[in-house]
Structures are given as structure tokens and as C-alpha cells.
Amino acid sequence: MAKNSIRVRYAPSPTGHLHIGNARTAIFNYLFARHNKGKFIIRIEDTDTKRNIEDGERSQLENLKWLGLDWDEGPDVGGDYGPYRQSERRDIYTPLIQQLLDEGKAYESYRTEEELQADREAQKARKEMPHYEYEYAGMSEEEKQAAIDEAKAKGLKPVIRFRVPKDEVFAWDDMVKGHVSFNSDTIGGDFVIAKRDGMPTYNFAVVVDDHKMAISHVFRGDDHVANTPKQLMIYQAFGWEAPKFGHMSLIISKDTGKKLSKRDESVLQFIEQYRSLGYLPEAMFNFILLLGWSPVGEEEIFNKKQFIKMYDETRLSSSPATFDSDKLEWLNNRYVKDADDSTIMDLALKQLIKAGNMPANPDAKTIEWARQLINLYKRQMSYMAQINDMASVFFEEPEQVSGEAFDEINNDTAPVVLKEFAAQIEALDLFDSVEIFKVIKSVQAKTGIKGRQLWMPIRIAVTHEMHGPELPESIELVGRETALEHIHQTLAQLKG
């Protein structure tokens, strides 16, 4: 197949926000298209009207754009193969469903939900796999028609079921998993292709859409493997050529070793959550791509252009991918360190404002102070929201020094250092990091105390923390008045 005939799609359902797993599907399809100079299409699969949420589509597209993805066709940009929402394509589906009915490849089914549930319970009691039992089994055409007429007289509306071929093998060479095959007798019987309201089900609509939109390759999650034989049956029924399929491995939790579940609230799983915490989109793109795909060599950090150039679908792994939030934090920290100061300033300032640690409309003096603060913590932050906890000493009145920190300075030399340091910074004409550094050296010279016994009492007294960024810069941002107040409080505590 020529590269320019490659067409792939990401087809989200607006039943929720963009999940890590779905973002991975979008990224893999995007890179495959861009690497091969093909087309990347967005299609909204909104046939599940009961579960669609109000801002589902907007949120999906907005977060894809935030990750750095763009598309050639879609509901917002149009294209030659529209409409790009399934809810707007019923005029395409309806005659095709009727065609299958006319050809005897599908039929009306009036079995109620209660009857189907009773069937499932009986099958369970017999230790059988749940499956649809043909409701017209053993009936003559006259008896079948009588049953249909009776159902209609009761006001029942039918679903449309696809007539599954008996004992036939449906197979494909999966681009990730290798050769996969299913016997038609194992898929659960005749399946629904149109609901009672006439809306097509996923398995029918996706086949029609992929065919009509000339989709050449389908990359999707491993949970769609069981759908593939059903879709191949529909392709066969229409005499259409199926696209090539690639089913990506499951994503499992590092902590549980089990499939990442949307119900597991201990793990952040939605792109919007990471945006809200101030993660960088480039880092998220990089991290998500490594969930089931690996570049050649040891290096794992590249920009999007490099990933497009090197992308090779044969390096997709069939083994489960482990979601490791610690690795994500490490990776994002690498990107934070390399990001330009203005980007980090903008993102971190938003976090400070959101937490109430900065006014919504700070003046120039406050912004300059914030700039110094953010630069001070930039290399330590894994994501921007951490600035509020890391720099809490600048926003909250600290409690008394306690625990390990108090034990560290509860000695004879700490009061000597603190008294001398307080006296010298109080006498400074210019209170900045350069002068503060000079004072620390002067205290060392005057007291003969050096190393940890010198700077640890100063850090703990001023910031109430044992660790942190550069000490002189931290003290400058705390301010002379507050620094002296903290030192005197600590001295009183040590006397106590």
C-alpha cells in the first residue's frame, strides 16, 4: 500500500474525558500517519446517547490538542468523508442495515431484556458461556411471522441482530499480536447491530465508517480483540475489504499488577488531571508513547518531530505496559529543567494563584518576586502544583521546629550561629542573596563553626525545613523581617 493511501483514525466516545489509554491510542495512530505521510482522522462515536456527557467531545478534542496532536479530518475541521459524528450518519447506516435484512443476513429480534436475562441465568446454571439463543429456533416461517406479529401487537420494538455464520473461522494477522483466529461459534451468538431506536451499535457503525472513510489501518486497545471477528463478519457480509488491525497491549498498574481501571481513584488516569497539576504536554506525550512502544537504543527522551521520524509500528509490544507514576514524575522533571523560564513561570504562577498563594491579578512587584521563587524551585519540581507545598514557608506561618529538625539544632553551637547571623543580617544595608552569602561566610569566620553545623541551623530556623534550594536565595525571598522573626522564635524554643 502506498504511503499516501494510509488513513488511520482515533474514534473517541464522548461518554467521558480523555483517558491515558485512549490518549495512547490517539498518539500511536497519529505517529503512524505522520511517519507514513498519511492522514489522521478524528471520528466521534456518539451512538451511546444515554452515556454521552455534555462536554465529552469538547474535552476530548481540547486535550488531544494540548498533547500536541493535530488532525487532517474531523468534526471541527471537516473533510471529504464526513459527517464525522456517528449521530449524524444515520442516513448512511439505515439503508445498509436494510440491505442485510433483505439479504437474510440480519433479522428483527423482539426478545425483551427480561427474557435475555432469564436466558443468561439459565445458561449460568448449566455452566455455559452466556450467549444469545435464537428465539425462532424450530419455528416454521408461519410460526415465526406469528411470533413477530404478536410482539408488534404488544408494542414491542425490535433490535436488529446479525446472523452469525455457523462454525466458520475468522482470522487476521494482527500488527501487534500476530496471527489471531476465532471460531464463529464462540462469540456469543447472533449479535445486535441496531438498537430498538434504530441507532446502530458500535460493531456495525465502526465497520461502515471505516469502510466509507477508506481507513487502511486500525490501531486500538487489546480490549477490542473480541470485537474484531464480529466486525470481520460484517465486512464479509458486504463484500468489503477489511483494514489491517493492530491491538495494543493492556496498561497495568505498577502497584497492583492488574489492568488499569478507571474506577481506581488512587491513580490519576485522565489527561485533564495532569493538565490541572501543571504537567508539561511534551512530557505527557513522551511518557504515553513509551507505554507499549520503545525506540531503538537506550535513550527515551525525544521531541515530537524525532518521534515522528523514528516511529516504527513493529516495535509495538504485545506484553502489558506498566503505568509507573514515579517514572512520569521523573520524566516531567527532565522536561521542566529544559523548558524555558517563561513557560515554567506561566504554569507555576497559575498554580500559585489557584491555591490562593498569589492574588488573581498580581502587580509587577509581586510577579517579580514570584519569578524568583519559581526559578528557585524549578529544578526540583516534578510538576507545577508542587510549588505550593515546596514553597509553603513563604505563604504559611510555620509551626515550631519539631522532630528530626529540632534534634538537628538542639545543641550548643546552633544558638551561637543563629544569634550572630541575626545580628549581621539586621545590620545589612542591602538585603539580597549575594550579601546574605557574605554574612554566612562572615559568621563562619567569626564563630569558627562551619559545614553542616553552620548552615543547617540557619536553614531550619528560617524555613523550618532541613532541605531546600539555595539557602541565600531562599532567605532573600523570605524577607529580612520574617527571617529575623523565625530566628528569634527558634532561639526562644531552644532556650525553652
Swiss-Prot record:
Keywords: Aminoacyl-tRNA synthetase, ATP-binding, Cytoplasm, Ligase, Nucleotide-binding, Protein biosynthesis. It catalyses: tRNA(Glu) + L-glutamate + ATP = L-glutamyl-tRNA(Glu) + AMP + diphosphate. HAMAP family: Glu_tRNA_synth_type1. Belongs to the class-I aminoacyl-tRNA synthetase family. Glutamate--tRNA ligase type 1 subfamily. GO terms for cellular component: cytosol. Catalyzes the attachment of glutamate to tRNA(Glu) in a two-step reaction: glutamate is first activated by ATP to form Glu-AMP and then transferred to the acceptor end of tRNA(Glu). This is Glutamate--tRNA ligase 2. A motif ('KMSKS' region) lies at residues 259-263. It comes from Levilactobacillus brevis (strain ATCC 367 / BCRC 12310 / CIP 105137 / JCM 1170 / LMG 11437 / NCIMB 947 / NCTC 947) (Lactobacillus brevis). Monomer. A motif ('HIGH' region) lies at residues 12-22. Its main location: cytoplasm. It is an enzyme of class 6 (ligase). GO terms for biological process: glutamyl-tRNA aminoacylation. It is found in: Cytoplasm. Its EC number is 6.1.1.17. One of its GO terms (molecular function) is tRNA binding. ATP binds at K262.
